[in-house]
Amino acid sequence: MTANYKIDAMTELRKFLWNQLKEYSIFDPEEYYSDNLGKEIIPILPVQQSAEMNQFLSGKKHIVYDKIGMSYEDNWAVCCEQILFTIYSVDVTDINEIRNFMTDEFRRMDDSAKDVRLSGLVSDKIKFFSIYVADISPTSPSEELQGFLSADVVLEIKYSRILDNSGRFI
């Protein structure tokens, strides 16, 4: 059996976060519908985004994410990662709302991971053990996007990939 190396805890967590942000009406997916693509654009984007995407998101709140640290513990089956989410908006109220939601959703460590696991939204090839808020930055003018404010939320996650009998990813 060949492992699917495209599965990544960070992108699986993104699926869950997007669903929750929609469910709590923090984001309206209709505001992110692209006529050019004929589909909804998920405004939680990897750090390398195209100029076209910046133009599409002009003036719209969105989140950019990246992996900022990864290591395995003494138990080599458990991975520990830090994921940086940078929230952008022209309105400080939007940033506060998203930051407060993420704090509430992910501060509960094992229970936060359980919610993600049981959501049915993430791959069954990853098991989340713990998710918590490791750091939150204050809101400030964005250095990357003129006219936007930004704030960072760093989540630390512990998880494992489901393994075969030899300890390799399934």
Question: What are these language model-derived features?
Answer:
Residues 1-71:
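Small/polar-rich, solvent-exposed N-terminal microdomains that initiate assembly or binding
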Residues 58-60, 78-82, 150:
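Short connector loops at helix/strand junctions that flank enzyme active sites
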